[in-house]
From Swiss-Prot:
Official protein name in the record: Zona pellucida sperm-binding protein 3
Record PTM text: Proteolytically cleaved before the transmembrane segment to yield the secreted ectodomain incorporated in the zona pellucida. N-glycosylated.
Role according to the record: Component of the zona pellucida, an extracellular matrix surrounding oocytes which mediates sperm binding, induction of the acrosome reaction and prevents post-fertilization polyspermy. The zona pellucida is composed of 3 to 4 glycoproteins, ZP1, ZP2, ZP3, and ZP4. ZP3 is essential for sperm binding and zona matrix formation.
Cytoplasmic face residues: 405-424
Location of this chain's protein in the cell: Cell membrane
Alphabetical keyword list: Cell membrane, Cleavage on pair of basic residues, Disulfide bond, Extracellular matrix, Fertilization, Glycoprotein, Membrane, Receptor, Secreted, Signal, Transmembrane, Transmembrane helix
Similarity section: Belongs to the ZP domain family. ZPC subfamily.
Tissue specificity field: Expressed in oocytes.
PANTHER family reported for this sequence: ZONA PELLUCIDA SPERM-BINDING PROTEIN 3
Positions annotated as propeptide: 349-424
Length: 424
C-alpha cells in the first residue's frame, strides 16, 4: 500500500519537479573555462621590453606554436623554449624590432605589436587558428626615473630612436641685423658683422639643445682647403673673438634648439678672391643636460678679458684659454682630418642625422671706399672735383675767346672821322 501511494504521488508530479528523480549534471569537456591569468603579459623594463605569451593564447585549449609568433614590424623571433613550457618569451631592447616611439608632454611612449601568423604544418594546406595582432605599449615618465638606477631612461636609446622615428634637420643661415629674417643678399662691406643662425628642427623628439662645435672659413666649399681661418674651435670656443674682431655668441638664446652668433667679415691676405665660405659642425644634446666642456658656447669678452658661456657653469670655458677641452686635448680640425670627411652641403642645405657639417656661402665682400683710396685708386669724390675744375678752366677760356672776337668785330664796323684843316 505504501509503495502504491508513493508511485501515485510521483505520477501526479511528473512534470519534472525532480522530486522522484535527482537532477543529473553533465560536464562539458569540449569548451573548458577561460584561463584566469592573462594570455599576454608585458614587462616594461629600464631599456628592455619583455613579453610572455601563453601557448593557450586564445583560451580554447589549442596551443599555438612558438614559430608562429613574432614581435614588431621586423618580425623578431622569441627565445628558444621547450615543448613542455607553457609560455613563449620575448626579450628585446626598446628601440629594436621596429618599435615606434612618441614623445608626449609627460611620457615617452614605445609602441609595437605581437603577431600570431599561423602557417600550415607539413604538407597540409589548412589552418586551425586565426591570424591575430595584439598591440603592446610601454609608457615612461619623462621627468622621473623608471628604475632604481641613476640613469636617464629616455637617453639610453635616444640616438637609435631618433634615427628610426624622425631624423633631425640642421640648418645654418645668414640673417639680417635684427635676426628677424634671412639675409637676401650675400654681399658685405669689409669689417661688417655677419649674423649667423644655426638651428635644428626637432619634430616630436625630446627637447634638444644645439651647439656649434667647430667653424672654419675657407675660399672654397672644401673646409679642408688652404688657406683657412678657424672661427670656433675646441668644442664651442669662438676663438675668432680673441683677435681684434668682436665676434661672439648671442646670449641668451631665443630657443634651446637655436644658436646665434656674429662674425666680423674679413678676406684672406695675398689672395685676389673677395669671397669666403663658412662651414660649421653642429650637434645636439638633451635640453635637460647641463652644458660641459664638450658641449658649450663660449665667447671672449675683451672688457673683462675672460671667457663667458651662453649658459651653464662659467668654468666650462676655462679650457678655451688652454686650447684643450675634453679628453682628446686637441683642435677639432686636427682630429677631424684623421678620418674621411663627410659630404659637403651647399648654402642652406639641411642634413638629416644626429650631427651635421653645414656650409654657408659664398659671402662676397665689396670692400670700402677708404680701403680703395689707400690702395692708390682715385676715389669718386676726387674724380668729381677734378672734373669740375677742368670744366671751369675750359669755360673761362671759351668766354675769353668769344669776348675778344666780339670786340674786334665791333671795332672794324665803326666809321672813321678824320679832322680837316682849313687853309686860308
Amino acid at each position: 500500500m505504501g509503495l502504491s501511494y508513493g508511485l501515485f504521488i510521483c505520477f501526479l508530479l511528473w512534470a519534472g519537479t525532480g522530486l522522484c528523480y535527482p537532477p543529473t549534471t553533465t560536464e562539458d569537456k569540449t569548451h573548458p573555462s577561460l584561463p584566469s591569468s592573462p594570455s599576454v603579459v608585458v614587462e616594461c623594463r629600464h631599456a628592455w621590453l619583455v613579453v610572455n605569451v601563453s601557448k593557450n593564447l586564445f583560451g580554447t585549449g589549442r596551443l599555438v606554436r612558438p614559430a608562429d609568433l613574432t614581435l614588431g614590424p621586423e618580425n623578431c623571433e622569441p627565445l628558444i623554449s621547450g615543448d613542455s613550457d607553457d609560455t613563449v618569451r620575448f626579450e628585446v631592447e626598446l628601440h629594436k624590432c621596429g618599435n615606434s616611439v612618441q614623445v608626449t608632454e609627460d611620457a615617452l611612449v614605445y609602441s609595437t605589436f605581437l603577431l600570431h601568423n599561423p602557417r600550415p604544418m607539413g604538407n597540409l594546406s589548412i589552418l586551425r587558428t586565426n591570424r591575430a595582432e595584439v598591440p603592446i605599449e610601454c609608457r615612461y615618465p619623462r621627468h622621473s626615473n623608471v628604475s632604481s638606477e641613476a640613469i636617464l631612461p629616455t637617453w639610453v636609446p635616444f640616438r637609435t630612436t631618433m634615427l628610426s622615428e624622425e631624423k633631425l634637420a640642421f640648418s645654418l643661415r645668414l640673417m639680417e641685423e635684427d635676426w628677424g629674417s634671412e639675409k637676401q643678399s650675400p654681399t658685405f662691406q669689409l669689417g661688417d658683422l655677419a649674423h649667423l643662425q644655426a638651428e635644428v628642427h626637432t619634430g616630436r623628439h625630446i627637447p634638444l639643445r644645439l651647439f656649434v662645435d667647430y667653424c672654419v672659413a675657407t675660399l672654397t666649399p672644401d673646409q679642408n682647403a688652404s688657406p683657412h681661418h678657424t672661427i670656433v674651435d675646441f668644442h664651442g670656443c669662438l676663438v675668432d673673438g680673441l683677435s681684434d674682431a668682436s665676434s661672439a655668441f648671442k646670449a641668451p638664446r631665443p630657443r634651446p634648439e637655436t644658436l646665434q652668433f656674429t662674425v666680423d667679415t674679413f678676406h684672406f691676405a695675398n689672395d685676389p678672391r673677395n669671397m669666403i665660405y663658412i662651414t660649421c659642425h653642429l650637434k645636439v644634446t638633451p635640453a635637460s643636460r647641463v652644458p660641459d666642456q664638450l658641449n658649450k658656447a663660449c665667447s671672449f669678452i675683451k672688457s673683462s678679458n675672460r671667457w663667458f658661456p651662453v649658459e651653464g657653469p662659467a668654468d666650462i670655458c676655462n679650457c678655451c684659454n688652454k686650447g684643450s677641452c675634453g679628453l682628446q686635448g686637441r683642435s677639432w680640425r686636427l682630429s677631424h682630418l684623421d678620418r674621411p670627411w663627410h659630404k659637403m652641403a651647399s648654402r642652406n642645405r639641411r642634413h638629416v642625422t644626429e650631427e651635421a657639417d653645414i656650409t654657408v656661402g659664398p659671402l662676397i665682400f665689396l670692400g670700402k671706399a677708404a680701403d680703395r683710396g689707400v690702395e692708390g685708386s682715385t676715389s669718386p669724390h676726387t674724380s668729381v672735383m677734378v672734373g669740375i675744375g677742368l670744366a671751369t678752366v675750359l669755360s673761362l677760356t671759351l668766354a675769353t675767346i668769344v669776348l675778344g672776337l666780339a670786340r674786334r668785330h665791333h671795332t672794324a664796323s665803326r666809321p672813321m672821322i678824320c679832322p680837316v684843316s682849313a687853309s686860308q
